[in-house]
A protein has these predicted regions:
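Alpha-helical metal-binding/catalytic segments enriched in His/Glu/Asp
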Residues: 73-78
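Extended beta-strand/beta-hairpin segments
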Residues: 1-72, 84-166
Length: 166
Protein backbone atom coordinates (compact mmCIF):
# COMPACT_ATOMS: atom_id res chain seq x y z
CA UNK A 1 0.00 0.00 0.00
CA UNK A 2 1.29 3.47 -0.80
CA UNK A 3 0.52 6.85 0.79
CA UNK A 4 -2.24 7.70 -1.70
CA UNK A 5 -3.99 4.36 -1.16
CA UNK A 6 -3.77 4.78 2.62
CA UNK A 7 -5.16 8.31 2.36
CA UNK A 8 -8.05 7.10 0.15
CA UNK A 9 -8.80 4.42 2.70
CA UNK A 10 -8.67 6.65 5.77
CA UNK A 11 -9.87 10.06 4.55
CA UNK A 12 -13.60 9.16 4.48
CA UNK A 13 -13.26 7.85 8.03
CA UNK A 14 -11.45 10.98 9.21
CA UNK A 15 -14.12 13.18 7.62
CA UNK A 16 -16.88 11.19 9.28
CA UNK A 17 -15.17 11.32 12.68
CA UNK A 18 -14.72 15.10 12.39
CA UNK A 19 -18.42 15.62 11.72
CA UNK A 20 -19.69 12.75 13.91
CA UNK A 21 -17.25 12.37 16.83
CA UNK A 22 -19.40 9.66 18.44
CA UNK A 23 -18.87 7.43 15.40
CA UNK A 24 -15.16 7.27 16.25
CA UNK A 25 -15.82 5.59 19.61
CA UNK A 26 -15.66 1.83 19.08
CA UNK A 27 -15.83 -0.72 21.88
CA UNK A 28 -13.35 -3.53 21.33
CA UNK A 29 -14.13 -6.76 23.16
CA UNK A 30 -12.46 -9.95 24.24
CA UNK A 31 -14.04 -13.01 25.80
CA UNK A 32 -12.40 -15.71 27.84
CA UNK A 33 -13.67 -18.85 29.53
CA UNK A 34 -12.02 -20.43 32.54
CA UNK A 35 -10.54 -23.69 31.30
CA UNK A 36 -9.35 -26.92 32.83
CA UNK A 37 -6.67 -26.76 35.49
CA UNK A 38 -5.41 -23.23 35.80
CA UNK A 39 -6.05 -22.05 32.26
CA UNK A 40 -8.31 -19.65 30.45
CA UNK A 41 -9.45 -19.94 26.84
CA UNK A 42 -9.41 -16.64 24.95
CA UNK A 43 -11.47 -16.01 21.84
CA UNK A 44 -9.57 -13.47 19.78
CA UNK A 45 -12.05 -13.22 16.95
CA UNK A 46 -9.50 -14.80 14.62
CA UNK A 47 -8.36 -17.76 16.69
CA UNK A 48 -8.59 -19.46 20.06
CA UNK A 49 -5.73 -19.37 22.54
CA UNK A 50 -5.31 -20.97 25.92
CA UNK A 51 -3.53 -18.93 28.56
CA UNK A 52 -2.03 -20.47 31.64
CA UNK A 53 0.47 -19.93 34.39
CA UNK A 54 3.97 -18.83 33.42
CA UNK A 55 6.60 -21.44 34.35
CA UNK A 56 7.97 -18.98 36.94
CA UNK A 57 4.62 -19.31 38.77
CA UNK A 58 4.25 -23.08 38.43
CA UNK A 59 2.98 -23.38 34.86
CA UNK A 60 4.08 -26.16 32.52
CA UNK A 61 4.89 -23.79 29.65
CA UNK A 62 2.35 -25.43 27.31
CA UNK A 63 -0.12 -22.52 27.46
CA UNK A 64 0.50 -18.95 26.37
CA UNK A 65 1.35 -16.51 29.13
CA UNK A 66 -0.84 -13.42 29.44
CA UNK A 67 2.26 -11.31 30.06
CA UNK A 68 3.74 -12.53 26.78
CA UNK A 69 0.42 -11.77 25.06
CA UNK A 70 0.59 -8.21 26.38
CA UNK A 71 4.09 -7.78 24.95
CA UNK A 72 2.95 -9.37 21.67
CA UNK A 73 0.03 -6.93 21.50
CA UNK A 74 2.46 -4.03 21.97
CA UNK A 75 4.82 -5.37 19.29
CA UNK A 76 1.95 -5.96 16.86
CA UNK A 77 0.34 -2.56 17.40
CA UNK A 78 3.69 -0.76 17.21
CA UNK A 79 4.53 -2.64 14.01
CA UNK A 80 1.23 -1.81 12.31
CA UNK A 81 1.48 1.81 13.44
CA UNK A 82 5.10 2.02 12.27
CA UNK A 83 4.08 0.77 8.81
CA UNK A 84 1.09 3.13 8.63
CA UNK A 85 3.18 6.16 9.65
CA UNK A 86 6.00 5.19 7.27
CA UNK A 87 3.50 4.78 4.44
CA UNK A 88 1.68 8.05 5.16
CA UNK A 89 4.91 10.06 5.41
CA UNK A 90 6.70 8.47 2.47
CA UNK A 91 9.39 7.01 4.72
CA UNK A 92 11.46 4.48 2.75
CA UNK A 93 11.59 1.40 4.96
CA UNK A 94 13.02 -1.78 3.49
CA UNK A 95 12.41 -3.96 6.53
CA UNK A 96 11.60 -3.54 10.20
CA UNK A 97 11.59 -5.74 13.27
CA UNK A 98 9.86 -4.82 16.50
CA UNK A 99 11.05 -6.24 19.82
CA UNK A 100 9.35 -5.98 23.20
CA UNK A 101 10.67 -7.08 26.56
CA UNK A 102 9.30 -6.69 30.04
CA UNK A 103 10.64 -7.38 33.51
CA UNK A 104 8.39 -9.12 36.03
CA UNK A 105 9.20 -9.84 39.66
CA UNK A 106 7.10 -12.94 40.28
CA UNK A 107 7.38 -12.49 44.06
CA UNK A 108 4.57 -9.93 43.69
CA UNK A 109 2.00 -12.10 41.93
CA UNK A 110 2.87 -15.08 44.14
CA UNK A 111 2.48 -12.91 47.26
CA UNK A 112 5.96 -13.85 48.44
CA UNK A 113 6.91 -10.22 49.09
CA UNK A 114 4.20 -7.62 49.66
CA UNK A 115 6.64 -4.89 48.57
CA UNK A 116 7.27 -6.55 45.19
CA UNK A 117 5.27 -4.97 42.38
CA UNK A 118 2.58 -7.07 40.71
CA UNK A 119 2.96 -6.42 37.01
CA UNK A 120 5.75 -5.29 34.75
CA UNK A 121 8.41 -3.14 36.39
CA UNK A 122 9.62 -1.98 32.98
CA UNK A 123 8.67 -2.60 29.38
CA UNK A 124 11.11 -1.96 26.55
CA UNK A 125 10.14 -1.43 22.92
CA UNK A 126 12.92 -1.56 20.32
CA UNK A 127 12.83 -1.06 16.58
CA UNK A 128 15.34 -2.45 14.09
CA UNK A 129 14.76 -0.59 10.84
CA UNK A 130 16.55 -1.15 7.57
CA UNK A 131 16.45 2.18 5.74
CA UNK A 132 18.54 4.77 3.96
CA UNK A 133 16.61 7.60 5.62
CA UNK A 134 18.55 10.06 7.82
CA UNK A 135 18.49 9.75 11.63
CA UNK A 136 16.22 12.80 11.93
CA UNK A 137 13.51 11.06 9.89
CA UNK A 138 13.96 7.81 11.84
CA UNK A 139 13.55 9.70 15.12
CA UNK A 140 10.40 11.37 13.82
CA UNK A 141 9.01 8.02 12.61
CA UNK A 142 9.47 6.51 16.08
CA UNK A 143 8.01 9.59 17.79
CA UNK A 144 4.89 9.40 15.59
CA UNK A 145 4.64 5.64 16.09
CA UNK A 146 4.66 6.11 19.86
CA UNK A 147 2.10 8.89 19.57
CA UNK A 148 -0.40 6.91 17.49
CA UNK A 149 0.09 3.34 18.78
CA UNK A 150 -3.03 2.49 20.79
CA UNK A 151 -1.41 -0.22 22.92
CA UNK A 152 1.68 1.90 23.62
CA UNK A 153 -0.45 4.85 24.71
CA UNK A 154 -2.72 2.64 26.83
CA UNK A 155 0.24 1.11 28.67
CA UNK A 156 1.97 4.48 29.02
CA UNK A 157 -1.06 6.21 30.59
CA UNK A 158 -2.91 5.55 33.79
CA UNK A 159 -6.19 4.00 32.75
CA UNK A 160 -9.04 3.04 34.99
CA UNK A 161 -10.23 -0.53 34.67
CA UNK A 162 -13.80 -0.94 35.84
CA UNK A 163 -14.40 -4.42 37.23
CA UNK A 164 -17.84 -5.91 37.78
CA UNK A 165 -19.59 -9.24 38.25
CA UNK A 166 -22.46 -10.04 35.88
Amino acid sequence: MNADQLKQLQEPLKTKYRTEPDAALVTLKAKAKAGEGITCKIETGKSLAEAGLHPATGGDGLSVCSGDMLLEALAACAGVTLKAVATATGFNMKEAFIYTEGDLDFRGTLSVDKEAQVGFKEIRLRFQIETDEPNEKITNLIKLTERFCVVYQTLNQSNEIKTSVI
